[in-house]
Amino acid sequence: MAAKSGSLSINSENIFPIIKKWLYSDHDIFYRELISNGCDAVTKLKKLDMMGEYSLPEGYKGRVDVIVDPEKKTLTFKDNGLGMTSDEVEEYINQIAFSGATDFIEKYKDKSNSDQIIGHFGLGFYSAFMVADEVHIDTLSYKDGAKAVHWECDGGTEFSMEDGDKTDVGTTITLFLNEDCLEFCNEYKAREVVKKYCSFMPTEIYLSKANTKETQIIKEEEKLPDDEVLEEIEPEKKEKTEGENAEAEAAEEPKKLKIRKRPELINETQPLWTKHPNECTKEEYLDFYRKVFQDYKEPLFWIHLNMDYPFNLKGILYFPKINMEYESIEGTIKLYNNQVFIADNIKEVIPEFLLLLKGVIDCPDLPLNVSRSALQNDGFVKKIAEYITKKVADKLAGMCKTDKEEYDKYWDDISPFIKFGCLKDDKFCEKMNDYILFKNLDGKYLTLPECLEIKPQDEEENKENAVDENGNKVEAEVVEDKAEDEASEENTEEEKKEKIIYYVTDEQQQSQYINMFKAAKMDAVILTHNIDQPFISQLEQKNEGIKFQRIDADVTDALKSKTSKKAEKEMEEQAESISKLMKKALKNDKITIKVEKLKNKKISSMITLSEESRRMQDMMKMYSMPGMDMSAFGGEGETLILNANHPLVQYITEHQDGENAEMICEQLYDLAKLQHAPLDADAMTKFVARSNDIMMLLTK
């Protein structure tokens, strides 16, 4: 071939500045593009052999070599694939944006598996100019009579092409790095980048350093054809003792060779996700997880995706074990295209809530743009996301049905993920509705229907404690007869009545309320995660007639002693009288005060805040509006409940003009506040001082 020079067939001379600054967001991505081209060349050659159009040499093993040379400031990518003729160089290299892979598939679409061809974009080779001032190509085609070709370009639109001296089939691309990118010919940096993008490419990838001084010792029988022998190491002779008489005889060890350090194999050509789930062991799944995510905490469980129709998708999703107190929930879903790494956490393909997991997904059918770094947001991509969501929901539902005990163990770890998924995806929420669990006060895990079946109090206890209008005990049989007479009316009212599920957000802070509930044989569920509040709001919207109420939002009838109407009237009068004293002592006219006969006689006072008001306060805190008056929104403030069964409340009721009445009122209020929420600094200072005064009174 006569030497040739010319201009690249492009639309604009500004193509290289665009490639360098815009086409690829990560400059190290040229590694992926050039190695992918080499893998494609190897795959194509193997396909031609399978179709009978070429015979591979005996013992052929496809490979791509990455060779760093810090002294010459070069980076070389070498493959033993099908190579190129001068015409193909003209077509695939000199005409930018023409894809060799696309042309190859079109020609052999009836004979080959096009899914195995990685390259789609034609511009991949030109990513080399992101880091190189000059690029050389040396190539020799597999075709009979083909001549080697040498091609050069200095990053402008001019190139030169002539006969080359390459003698082995394949392609070698040499990058002469610019001064700003010399880090890429560092062996450690090269290893890092190749592992990042090419850890699972289907062709073996080797990394080496040109003219390395490093050596290794091997046995003579382990020598490979490409090994460079630096020294033959003669075996040592040693004395061997046999029998009674010691005789020196030569006992030779195997002959050894000192060779230049071999290229390092970087990738795994058959990653776990390419296998059928039935072929994978638990230990293989765990090893893969540790290797890919550098997380040595064992995952809870995993889902192996394996789909061939209507699109090709494989992958493994792991549910990591999360320390809820100390760790943020951040996952990583690695997206691959034919075992070539594309990016982490691409939201167009991976549903947002699944980004809390760790895993890999490989989909050869993904419609990528020219840089392979983004996805076209189309209907196909949406179907992929829907399929992944469905598989995750099916796995969780199946686990709950077939192994509820194991599902219960996982629940605390996976509940934030599932609840987030329900908030973000209506279809996922619909599938998971019957498999969402709630942990109750006894540590049992209940479904939503099971929570709704919890009775508010023990019916037998109601019968035993029933009294008439005058406070006299009523026999249980009378209660039953009366209940039967009112049954039809109650059934009608029950249909309209909201079903309340009580919940706890802080088991320590709300311990007094929990003890009261347990004493009354009532139950509540534990909701301590930040996501629980928006989640229960969604449940209320989707399930008519269900209401969630925090355990300290109100004093239910089940926590009160049964009283006659006469006693209720007396308490109302007491409340009116004592309310004036409390408001005066607290210097607070807005507080609501109630007097109730609580079953637990050890509790003197308690604070309640309606569910609506508390949620409004939480919302205001979220939007940085703390301290706003609830009444402006139609909400109620705090209510102070005084227990008429407690001696202190009885004392101030009878001694409202007493010397210490106001001090006792203040102490009752602060004790109630402490059980509800922490006191602010000023209130705590006063509380401590007052407590000391009370103890001083006890010493007199």
Regions found by a protein language model. Name each.
Residues 1-179, 183-184, 192, 199, ...:
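GHKL (Bergerat-fold) ATPase N-terminal catalytic module, capturing the glycine-rich phosphate-binding loop
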Residues 117, 135-158, 178-181, 188-700:
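GHKL/Bergerat-fold ATPase module in large chromosome/replication-associated machines
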